[in-house]
């Protein structure tokens, strides 16, 4: 089982390959303290999402050790592991039904107040009150909502899960700037009490991280705070300036 209380994560010399002769992660060692905002950046294909797959028990065939709260994740049942972490991607699934039904997937006994509180945090409550409130109906995959609204609703649902660890895998890609800014504000606030593991190709979103891992070809090329990495004038600084 995963221990109770604040959890830290440690990876030691983690290697992973989808195919025998093509290693994706080449000896990754990282430590994530509890209640920290950790970001992973780098060109696509550098191993960021593969790493998220290992942490969520999707990618099992790795070598090396991955521990949560000092317990190796290979000794933890997947459903037990996932009760301690919530993963939000850029296309989080919403199903046809009411907003209330979608939110209660995360917490079946959530009260009206709890649901309205998380909707307020993601700035959707006023919009929904102009519709049918919690009874507002979503079409299949939420297609009657904008991309930014769908993502904010997925985030509201994630907040109801209330797990110690949150993994955001490109959760702010392909949405409007206003929604992106709102989501980043929620994530920054969340990082005060939760561990945030944040994967992003947009470096402006990772500036406030406690630690940034710049990955390249399956290894950690650079690590540190934004200020530290900018002073290094290496790959991170080059990519950051290129994106300005």
Where are these regions (language model features)?
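ABC-type nucleotide-binding domain
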Residues: 2-244
């Amino acid at each position: 089982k995963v221990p109770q209380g604040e959890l830290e994560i440690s990876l030691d010399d983690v290697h992973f390959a989808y195919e025998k002769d093509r290693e994706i992660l080449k000896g990754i060692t990282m430590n994530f303290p509890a209640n920290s905002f950790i970001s992973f950046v780098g060109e696509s294909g550098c191993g960021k999402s593969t790493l998220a797959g290992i942490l969520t028990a999707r990618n099992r065939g790795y070598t090396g050790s991955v521990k949560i709260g000092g317990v190796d994740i290979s000794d933890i049942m997947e459903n037990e592991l996932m009760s301690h972490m919530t993963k939000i991607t850029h296309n989080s699934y919403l199903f046809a039904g009411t907003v209330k039904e979608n939110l209660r997937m995360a917490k079946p006994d959530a009260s009206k107040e709890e649901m309205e509180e998380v909707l307020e945090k993601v700035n959707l409550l006023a919009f929904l009150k102009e519709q049918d409130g919690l009874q507002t109906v979503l079409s299949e995959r939420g297609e009657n909502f904008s991309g930014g609204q769908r993502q904010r609703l997925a985030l509201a649902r994630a907040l109801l899960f209330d797990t110690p660890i949150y993994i955001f895998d490109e959760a702010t890609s392909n949405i409007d700037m206003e929604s992106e800014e709102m989501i980043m504000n929620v994530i920054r606030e969340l990082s005060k009490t939760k561990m945030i593991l944040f994967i992003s190709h947009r470096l402006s979103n990772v500036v406030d991280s406690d630690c940034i891992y710049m990955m390249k070809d399956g290894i950690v090329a650079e690590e540190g705070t934004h200020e530290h990495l900018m002073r290094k004038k290496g790959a991170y600084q080059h990519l950051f300036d290129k994106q300005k």
